[in-house]
């Protein structure tokens, strides 16, 4: 590993540590109270731990799964001390994340055999969707890849304008039409343009309205179908962007979008301003969709590739 890569990696780690600070402080404050005055893990400690996990937005189903696994360990060792609880919890959360997040990437990469590699981005307005697209474009361009953006969220003039600002900032082309245009038509034009330009990566924004599930499903299905007329088997990735600071609302949004289309990866944003970072653990587990990216700050470098080991390490540091 080069000297510069080491510096970059340590900077990323510091940003991640800082981004999870609020979640960590709140979580371990609650955990300390949960085991106060107790020397061994008993039913009361487990009940308190359950409350801590649920109130940290890990989600009920995932919390129960973690508690069951810890109970199984306690039944094998009746004298398990509360001082060991951190280690056990860390191992169980790492294990859960490993079930869905099988990759171990730390860099922004795409498969070499798919060109252009097409990412369709979905998510409600206000979750940081446009910002995520801009930061992704920046990271891919930094890797020397040729990137094209598509503004297929045509129902909001601001969405097109915001994407144009990011395209100009990063220095990549944006394919767009006027507000109210057919999103599928924009997607078609974007892929046509990408093929002509021999682009490596295409990132297409889509409507951020959780209106009617059937309408949403029909719209996204049409966009996909039209893409496939230009490039077979696209999109290669359907990336759902969720705002980590909304906690349980993020679960509801994931439910709506996974019902409307096949979501293949997640980006969880705004983790730096919240104590609700536990949502990353719960959503990944409940929906069996890998978390690909996390937003841990407002800077252009603060969108990171999600690495389960680094995440757990920062969480329990």
Task: Map each language-model feature to its residues.
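Short beta-alpha junctions and helix-cap segments that line functional grooves
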Residues: 3, 105-107, 136, 252-253, ...
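Primarily NTPase-proximal linker/entry elements flanking Walker-type ATP/GTP-binding cores
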Residues: 17, 21-152, 159-179, 187-195, ...
